[in-house]
């Protein structure tokens, strides 16, 4: 069981960075196939693992792997990887809010990533692998703030990865709660990755991913999460 430190204040966990650059971002509320949908942008290591998970979530209409918050238009993947453009590998999650809410999406996100490391997910390291939640609608900030505070309060967690199925239920011996390294900020821009990069794990199932997709399949974890 998770224990709250006496007197611990959930407030002040999340510092939002409010930018004004929106020229590359369309309005979050849109329609796809006649259905009103919303978008949320999630980063958690290599985008192909995150995309594979969220593409299987009921209520998610579409996922697109790409790069978020680049300092230059249409960044090349090699420039993202070497840190030249300050972008992060990210997945655009388009969902039907009548079938799934942002809270469920964030619960899935915090289950499959390690939010306590900075630019490290499994064996993958680099600033482009940092974890992040990027929003385009201010109405999402209360939910994001709540979940950030909640997982900060829960302590040091392990992700579903490295063939180790642990649902963010771990505290170290000293009960130390490291700060969450996940950034939560307004989306500045998003550029889709090349087509060959979309649904990469389905094309190349042997590719290493910090998120153990096979274990998720074998245990039916996605059904549990949704």
Show which residues each predicted segment covers.
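Flexible coil/turn and secondary-structure edge motifs
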Residues: 2-226
């Amino acid at each position: 069981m998770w224990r709250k430190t006496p007197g611990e204040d959930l407030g002040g966990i999340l510092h939002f960075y409010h930018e004004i650059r929106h020229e590359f971002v369309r309005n979050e509320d849109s329609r796809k196939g006649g259905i009103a949908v919303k978008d949320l942008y999630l980063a958690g290591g290599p985008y192909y693992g995150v995309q594979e998970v969220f593409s299987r979530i009921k209520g998610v209409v579409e996922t697109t792997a790409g790069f978020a918050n680049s300092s230059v238009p249409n960044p090349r993947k090699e420039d993202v990887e070497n840190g030249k453009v300050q972008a992060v590998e990210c997945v655009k999650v388009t969902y039907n809010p009548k079938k799934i809410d942002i809270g469920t999406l964030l619960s899935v996100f915090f289950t499959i990533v390690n939010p306590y490391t900075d630019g490290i997910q499994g064996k993958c390291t680099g600033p482009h692998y940092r974890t992040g939640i990027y929003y385009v609608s201010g109405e999402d900030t209360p939910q994001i703030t709540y979940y950030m505070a909640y997982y900060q309060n829960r302590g040091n967690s392990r992700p579903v990865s490295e063939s180790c199925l642990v649902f963010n239920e771990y505290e170290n011996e000293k009960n130390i709660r490291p700060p969450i390294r996940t950034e939560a900020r307004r989306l500045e821009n998003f550029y889709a990755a090349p087509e060959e990069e979309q649904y990469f794990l389905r094309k190349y199932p042997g590719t290493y991913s910090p998120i153990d997709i096979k274990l998720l399949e074998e245990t039916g974890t996605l059904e549990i999460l949704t």
